[in-house]
């Protein structure tokens, strides 16, 4: 049975993006260690999963990109979950139109490497709400938005996670992953957690220094996976 990994950037106050869908933080892609962590994760995927909006954003960038991220995004199979998308022109892409739980169940039963989901917010929220995520890999950004598109919304019950691993990079970002079972590959660096049957006394403590710096350049979702 394949695991489903939700991998995304997130602000320290829990938002995937600002209300205008921008990501007003440094994505860390200029840092070699962060780049390697992302590439290792992306290349290890058996399939990339995403909602319609994220698919349209990525499909407009990766097919013609010369970025190091382009090859795994173009070559590894992709599944876009949408009931309205008529066709998917990005090679190696198919559309899943059925019930989300049933579609994910079928994908998990297929042989191959883990499934990695990237968003957008509505898709990520649905995966969490239905209990379909086995592992969270969250690149926690040292930025607070105050309002935006949250990762968790309308959960039927509190979701308790067990910390497995945490790493902070020179950019200030802390990759954080919540997994239910298997460990991450040793080349991956992240804060990792697994589902916990009951609340933990202390999951993690992260300290950030406050600066007057603000990132005014909003990078598109497809800037990094």
Q: Which ranges hold each PLM region?
A:
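Short, conserved catalytic or interaction motifs in soluble domains
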Residues: 135
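Portal/gating segments that form or line small-molecule/metal binding sites
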Residues: 1-132, 142-201, 205-208, 212-214
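Short, intrinsically disordered C-terminal tails of secreted or membrane-associated proteins
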Residues: 216-224
């Amino acid at each position: 049975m394949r695991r489903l990994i939700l991998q995304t950037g997130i602000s320290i106050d829990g938002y995937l993006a600002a209300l205008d869908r921008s990501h007003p933080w440094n994505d860390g892609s200029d840092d070699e260690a962060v780049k390697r962590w992302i590439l290792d994760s992306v290349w290890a995927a058996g399939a990339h999963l995403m909602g319609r909006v994220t698919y349209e954003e990525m499909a407009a960038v990766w097919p013609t990109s010369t970025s190091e991220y382009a090859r795994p995004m173009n070559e590894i199979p992709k599944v876009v979950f949408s009931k309205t998308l008529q066709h998917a022109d990005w090679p190696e892409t198919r559309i899943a139109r059925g019930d989300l739980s049933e579609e994910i169940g079928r994908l998990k039963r297929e042989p191959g490497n883990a499934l990695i989901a990237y968003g957008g917010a509505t898709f990520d929220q649905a995966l969490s709400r239905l209990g379909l995520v086995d592992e969270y890999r969250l690149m926690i950004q040292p930025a607070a938005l105050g309002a935006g598109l949250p990762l968790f919304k309308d959960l039927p019950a509190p979701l308790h996670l067990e910390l497995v691993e945490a790493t902070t990079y020179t950019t200030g970002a802390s990759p954080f992953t919540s997994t239910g079972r298997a460990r991450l590959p040793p080349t991956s660096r992240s804060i990792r957690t697994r589902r916990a049957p009951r609340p933990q006394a202390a999951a993690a403590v992260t300290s950030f220094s406050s600066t007057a710096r603000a990132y005014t350049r909003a990078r598109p979702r497809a800037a990094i996976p």
